């Protein structure tokens, strides 16, 4: 740039000097013509506005030999001519282009700069480089060579940089793209047909594999448990899209089947059950005993249905709604072991008959009736001599009655304020939802409560009167919902996961409240996964670990608290004990739990007594069945000899203290006359000794 400016200054000064020479008729040196030729050939460097005096040099320029082969200047009318000289005439200025440059250059304006013609016939000099017009945008910006195949779709640089190669659209490329898309469009139908065929084949293969698994006659390996093998004969219909899984374990049904098998009872109701009258009006239970039973019920069971005072269940209620009054006395009878079994049995049959009549009564049902139905759903096995009431059916029908009777269920949860009356209804509603969930997952049955109704359950915790037990019920509802969803998700069960993100999130908020239910749900999920992974040692270890945690926790429970447990707790403990019998029958926790259950049972019809007997019989069969030499191979591969004598030192002291515990219960009914407690206390010792002899 500096050289160009210097050239301009020198040229202007020299031209001015030579103008003075011409005006004085002096000779013009040859270098002046060289400068003029330079200006003619390089118009951008020497502007015509800065060397205006050259216009007056017409005489010496036109025929000078220096300009031969260069552009010849003929000047048109110029506005600067009069200013430069008064004697010199001005002619048109035109550019004559050399022969090699053709005639396709026009003068666009007075600047003298040529412009290319729009035609494509320009003849270029032989030595000039012709650049490719197919370079991509990236190579153009980098000013590098674009290594592109004429029919390619990206250059090497863009491929190596993993960026999009943007190419200018040409006629050839457009034709190539059009042909490529036409070929792809023509191939789409055939691809879709092949995909449909592959999907159909995969579906057939999957169904065939399931049938092969279901029809497998035997499973190798000693770690395959008896409970797992018993599930092979269950319904094996497809579980995809269903609301209940045929592969899920059924603890409640399992216990009922085992109990019927071991005891040999018919599990049918007596024919005269419908002709039973009112036990209270007939004087079978005297008024003093009934008052004590109501007090015991309020102390241990009233929290479930918002009954805080015996006056809430007054004597007039026995005439207006005998179902709640009779249910309260039946549940409280477990705290009075001296009540004859015949009386308890008669009460139970009367309540069953009244329940059947109530369920088909005209709607809406009274609040007290719904309270009684919720209690019966929580404790359906109060008497185990006959087939217990089906908690899933009972709670399901009761929920339908509650939807009709409880008006708040027909509104959005945010539309209403939780008051005292709504608290009492919410407690009954939560109890019904919980029992429906427990029985659905315990029997592998569908769960049909809509989500908009379940959203009302946690609203109970918004009221200041909400208790610790209310929080546990809400947490347990959420836990069983998660477990039921995972159990019905067959893909998750087939993967054999050992940790579930949904349960881990639940633990962060509620794990400190519910231990037994958490371990029970994990146990059910592991047992479900074992249907697809028969010999998974990790699953077996997790099953044993959760079973031991359940039994160890249960053995720490205080005796009065254990009697008030809902039946679901006994199913949890019993199922954990059965799993230990299945995989490790020599585990000492089995004997401890069966003795503790026997210790809790007030009579032989109680659920604890029946579960203790079932566990004892199943342990005997598991221990003696696989090996005639009484050697049992556990789930971890260790071998232990079956030796019941090792458990006798533990069992004898505990059995000796049982009568002392029952004797301590007499202070609960000090005013009861001796004739109201016949036979039971005097026969307990003989019955316990007979059972002890049987299990030892």
UniProtKB/Swiss-Prot annotation:
GO molecular-function terms, A-Z: DNA-binding transcription factor activity, RNA polymerase II-specific; transcription cis-regulatory region binding; zinc ion binding
Subcellular location: Nucleus
Gene from which the chain derives: prtT
InterPro entries: prtT (IPR051089), Zn2-C6_fun-type_DNA-bd_sf (IPR036864), Zn2Cys6_DnaBD (IPR001138)
Position of the signal peptide: none
Family: Belongs to the prtT family.
Short name of any one Pfam family annotated for the protein: Zn_clus
Record-linked PANTHER family: FINGER DOMAIN PROTEIN, PUTATIVE-RELATED (PTHR31845), TRANSCRIPTIONAL ACTIVATOR OF PROTEASES PRTT (PTHR31845:SF34)
Stated name of the protein: Transcriptional activator of proteases prtT
Matches recorded under PROSITE patterns: ZN2_CY6_FUNGAL_1, ZN2_CY6_FUNGAL_2
Known function: Transcription factor required for protein utilization and degradation. Regulates transcription of major secreted proteases including a serine alkaline protease (alk1), a metalloprotease (mep), an aspergillopepsin (pep1), a sedolisin (sed2) and two dipeptidyl-peptidases (dppIV and dppV). However, it is not a virulence determinant in leukopenic mice.
């Amino acid at each position: 740039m500096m050289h160009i400016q210097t050239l301009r200054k020198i040229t202007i000064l020299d031209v001015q000097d030579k103008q003075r020479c011409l005006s004085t008729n002096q000779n013009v040196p040859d270098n002046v013509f060289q400068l003029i030729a330079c200006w003619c050939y390089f118009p951008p460097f020497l502007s015509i506005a800065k060397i205006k005096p050259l216009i007056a040099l017409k005489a010496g320029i036109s025929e000078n030999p220096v300009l031969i082969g260069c552009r010849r200047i003929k000047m048109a009318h110029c506005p600067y001519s009069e200013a430069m000289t008064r004697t010199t005439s001005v002619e048109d200025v035109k550019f004559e282009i050399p022969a090699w440059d053709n005639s396709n250059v026009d003068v666009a304006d007075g600047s003298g700069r040529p412009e290319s013609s729009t035609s494509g016939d320009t003849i270029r000099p032989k030595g000039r480089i012709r650049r490719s017009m197919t370079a991509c945008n990236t190579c153009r910006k980098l000013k590098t060579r674009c290594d592109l195949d004429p029919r390619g779709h990206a250059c090497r640089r863009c491929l190596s940089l993993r960026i999009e190669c943007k190419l200018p659209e040409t006629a050839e490329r457009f034709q190539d793209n059009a042909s490529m898309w036409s070929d792809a469009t023509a191939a789409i139908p055939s691809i879709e047909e092949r995909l449909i065929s592959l999907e159909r084949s995969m579906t057939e293969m999957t169904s065939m594999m399931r049938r092969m698994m279901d029809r497998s006659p035997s499973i190798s390996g000693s770690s395959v448990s008896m409970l797992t093998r018993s599930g092979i004969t269950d319904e094996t219909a497809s579980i995809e899209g269903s609301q209940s899984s045929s592969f899920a374990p059924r603890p409640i049904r399992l216990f009922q089947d085992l109990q019927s098998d071991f005891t040999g009872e018919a599990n049918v109701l007596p024919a005269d059950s419908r002709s039973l009258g009112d036990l209270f009006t007939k004087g079978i239970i005297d008024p003093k005993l009934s008052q004590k039973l109501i007090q015991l019920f309020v102390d241990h069971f009233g929290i479930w249905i918002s009954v805080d005072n015996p006056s809430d269940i007054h004597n007039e209620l026995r005439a207006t709604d005998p179902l709640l009054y009779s249910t309260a006395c039946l549940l409280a009878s477990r705290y009075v072991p001296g009540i004859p079994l015949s009386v308890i049995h008669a009460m139970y049959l009367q309540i069953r008959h009244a329940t059947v009549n109530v369920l088909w009564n005209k709607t809406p049902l009274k609040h007290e009736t719904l309270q009684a139905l919720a209690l019966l759903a929580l404790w359906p096995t109060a008497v185990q001599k006959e087939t217990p009431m089906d908690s899933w059916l009972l709670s399901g029908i009761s929920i339908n009655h509650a939807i009709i009777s409880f008006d708040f269920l027909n509104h959005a949860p945010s539309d209403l304020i939780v008051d005292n009356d709504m608290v009492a209804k919410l407690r009954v509603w939560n109890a019904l939802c919980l029992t429906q969930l427990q029985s659905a997952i315990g029997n592998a049955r569908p769960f049909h409560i809509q989500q908009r109704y379940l959203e009302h359950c946690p609203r109970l915790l918004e009221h200041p009167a909400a208790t610790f037990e209310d929080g546990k019920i809400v947490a347990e509802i959420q836990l069983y919902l998660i477990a039921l969803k995972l159990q019905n998700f067959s893909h998750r069960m087939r993967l054999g996961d050992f940790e579930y993100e949904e349960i881990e999130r639940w633990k962060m908020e509620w794990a400190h409240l519910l231990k037994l239910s958490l371990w029970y749900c994990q146990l059910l999920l592991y047992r479900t996964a074992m249907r697809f992974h028969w010999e998974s040692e990790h699953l077996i270890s997790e099953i044993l670990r959760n079973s031991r945690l359940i039994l160890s926790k249960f053995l720490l429970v205080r005796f009065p608290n254990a009697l008030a447990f809902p039946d679901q707790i006994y199913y949890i403990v019993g199922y954990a004990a059965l799993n230990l019998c299945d995989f490790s029958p020599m585990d000492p926790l089995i004997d401890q739990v069966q003795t503790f259950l026997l210790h809790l049972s007030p009579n032989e019809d109680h659920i604890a007594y029946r579960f203790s007997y079932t566990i004892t019989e199943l342990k005997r069969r598991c221990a003696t069945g696989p090996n005639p030499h009484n050697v049992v191979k556990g789930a971890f591969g260790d071998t232990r000899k079956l030796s019941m004598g090792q458990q006798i030192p533990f069992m004898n002291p505990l059995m000796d203290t049982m009568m002392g515990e029952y004797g301590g219960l007499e202070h609960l009914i000090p005013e009861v006359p001796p004739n109201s407690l016949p036979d039971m206390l005097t026969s307990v010792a003989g019955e316990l000794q007979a059972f002890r002899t049987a299990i030892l």
